[in-house]
Amino acid sequence: MKRIVVLGAGESGAGAAVLAKVKGFDTFVSDMSAIKDKYKTLLDGHGIAWEEGRHTEEQILSADEVVKSPGIPNDAPLILRLREQGTPIISEIEFAGRYTDAKMICITGSNGKTTTTSLIYHIFKSAGLNVGLAGNIGKSLALQVAEEKHDYYVIELSSFQLDNMYNFRADIAVLMNITPDHLDRYDHCMQNYINAKFRITQNQTSEDAFIFWNDDPIIKRELDKHGIRAHLYPFSAIKEEGSIAYVEDHEVVITEPIAFNMEQEQLALTGQHNLYNSLAAGISANLAGITKEDIRKALSDFQGVEHRLEKVARVRGIDFINDSKATNVNSCWYALQSMTTKTVLILGGKDKGNDYTEIEELVREKCSALVYLGLHNEKLHEFFDRLGLPVAEVQTGMKDAVEAAYKLAKKGETVLLSPCCASFDLFKSYEDRGEQFKKYVREL
């Protein structure tokens, strides 16, 4: 009997283990951290052996194949041992893809992928399609393949997930943009990160679709290097050569495969960055054969994504906005660009090799003060202190950061949490960071 070992027992790992068990494999799960009770219950319910707080090497090195959590680096010692002995290491998405014939709509990019994924799912669901939401958001793809059997899956893919995908094929691949992110996981080499993102197009054929932002200089430069066989669907902010979707005379226009248009002001999502998200989602729905009426309705009634430019409250004339999902500099750039008032910016956390020059001009123009929130703020001091803005440093947690920002902000201004960094120095996740921000804002 083939032995499958799953490393990591979060949403993706637990789901992969259930699918492996359902398919009749000898299955073992190992997590170096504590496993959440809900995943223990799931594993126990399927009779799957597991361990937590350690990796027992003899159990793991005996695997015929390993399904690895995207959070485990490829250069972790145990992963290197497995590679040395020739054990195949794959992602949960790769594993799940073997056991379904459903259409796969896959979205990646440095920014905008969660909003775009959620919007595509909303359009498909609203149109009455049998669709699942998976990847970085929603339920484990493997668990859904084991238990639910959808006709379509809309999947948000990080570069880490793409790294361990080999035969998986996206029917529709969407690449929103590429800006520096996670370079600490890619030997601080931008080309390695770019190559990971373009893996979303591997295995595509001329029957498949590749949707991408035509204004992204890196994507345009790299297109010819990757032997893309899929039909190309480029989109841009304005009508330009090659683009099949754009805005013209305040109308969203999609020219292929079926002509589509709607008034830009009817879009539920506002701001330039959200225009790109809406264009990519509109093309995806168009390719899936969803009616123009259903696409228009869903693009106009979408509710947005939590922790992404989420309006929290107005306290004594000061607006508070939660953009905790901004874990890189480019995300913060989009957030600052959308600000219409002077802004107190809360930033900081686990730096991933950030270059803050990208937001320097916007910080000068838009910000009235800065709050550094993190255990190690030396890089922020080094870059931003010279701008001469009032600065508060907080190393204790979100409560003190919110109070510091509130004191610095004036009536009519905005406090924006848009950290540019990962959350893992003081918080469990970007969701935890955002929830704490909202909690302490409401306690002001």
Swiss-Prot record:
Organism, as annotated: Bacteroides fragilis (strain ATCC 25285 / DSM 2151 / CCUG 4856 / JCM 11019 / LMG 10263 / NCTC 9343 / Onslow / VPI 2553 / EN-2)
Gene3D superfamilies to which the protein is assigned, alphabetical: Mur ligase, C-terminal domain, Mur-like, catalytic domain, NAD(P)-binding Rossmann-like Domain
UniProt cross-references to InterPro entries, sorted A to Z: Mur-like_cat_sf, Mur_ligase_C, Mur_ligase_C_dom_sf, Mur_ligase_cen, MurD
Pathway(s) the chain acts in: Cell wall biogenesis; peptidoglycan biosynthesis
EC number: 6.3.2.9
Job of this protein: Cell wall formation. Catalyzes the addition of glutamate to the nucleotide precursor UDP-N-acetylmuramoyl-L-alanine (UMA).
GO annotation, biological process: cell division; cell wall organization; peptidoglycan biosynthetic process; regulation of cell shape
SUPFAM superfamilies: MurCD N-terminal domain, MurD-like peptide ligases, catalytic domain, MurD-like peptide ligases, peptide-binding domain
This protein's encoding gene: murD
Family: Belongs to the MurCDEF family.
Main location: cytoplasm
Key word Isomerase present: no
Binding site for ATP: G109, S110, N111, G112, K113, T114, T115
Protein name: UDP-N-acetylmuramoylalanine--D-glutamate ligase
Annotated Pfam families: Mur_ligase_C, Mur_ligase_M, MurD-like_N, MurD_N
One Gene Ontology MF term: UDP-N-acetylmuramoylalanine-D-glutamate ligase activity
GO CC, alphabetical: cytoplasm
